[in-house]
Amino acid sequence: MLMKLIVTLLFLPIIFLGSVRAQNKNIFEASNLLLFSFQENSFLISGDSIYTVSDDPLTAKAHGLENLTYNFVSQGDLAYLVNSSNGVVYSFEKQVFNRLGQSAPFLSQFGHFPFIRSSKLFTFGGYGLFTHKNIITQFNAATGETALQPTITKQNEMIPGLCKPMGQFIDNSLFIASGEIYNEDSPFKLDIRHSTEAWNFDFDTLEWFYLGQTNEMLSKGYRLSVLNYPEGSLYLDFDTAFSLDFPNNQIHFYKGSQMLNLASIEALTYNPSKGGFYIIKKRNRVQKELLFLNKSEMLGDLVETYPIYTNTIPWVEYGIILIVFSV
């Protein structure tokens, strides 16, 4: 009896928060759900409204966005919303979205990796029109146009086209690993294959550099991502949570909280000012709830660290070296 009471008391704050937040269950059923955090607040896009979920009680207003699915990315006081296939871009200032340019959705970069550099929105990769992309694009807010980022690396010596890559932008370098890659045996993504390579694009030299072969634990890809997590880009699958710290070549595997089933999470965001996560999770087959969890409640306290990649020479270069030495 005493043990049951202790467990109930431990879970009570979380259950109470969920019941207060989930005032209207219909807000969790929209096809364009997006949880994101900016500065001290966290928000939920659902249907034609944006909800400030960090307010108590939550507040709502119309967002004025096109009815698309979006990715959110921020850096300092800058924030952008870009549609999932690139092309449609909004800034986010004073909790208001402002359309930048009048481009239509590109339909060619689903599953791209967004980041901000020199106050500009950039994207890498994506899939669309039956091709995997290995391009970097940059959006010019002044002109409302998107342009290709130049590189001096030859096409046959650079990163392959990827959809849903894992990445991190830091110190003027873009790091990319894993991602869905073109499968010559199933070119229309009927059978997905993942890249086993890690790459770095240096914006100072405009070159792509091969880093090595990725940890086999990255071979499954991911389901959800949090790019503003302080320990590196955070990724979740149905039974795994890990963050990537590319500058230190470290992948941190979080062994999980006993309070949470990762497979039940449908959306999440990290709020730095609160030091925790807002998540939308399934309570059962028909009910969902919005919760706030601290890091320990979300990820657990046990962390295992491994290298993201091992330094190996690509087979093409290895063959060239063998030929040179044999001569």
Task: Give the label of every model feature segment.
Residues 304-327:
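C-terminal single-pass membrane-anchor helix
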Residues 56-57, 61-64, 98-104, 146-154, ...:
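Beta-propeller fold detector
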Residues 126-128, 133, 177-193:
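Short, conserved, GDST-rich strand-edge loop motifs in beta-rich repeat architectures
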Residues 225-230, 234-300:
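Extracytoplasmic/lumenal ectodomains and periplasmic regions of secretory and membrane proteins
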Residues 48, 85, 127-129, 180-182, ...:
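Residue-level signature of beta-propeller blades and closely related beta-rich strand-turn architectures
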Residues 24-39, 64-76, 106-115, 157-166, ...:
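Repeated scaffold domains used in trafficking and secretory/extracellular systems
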Residues 41-42, 77-80, 119-123, 172-177, ...:
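Entry beta-strands of beta-propeller and related beta-repeat scaffolds
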Residues 134-144, 189-206, 241-249, 288-306:
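Beta-propeller blade signature
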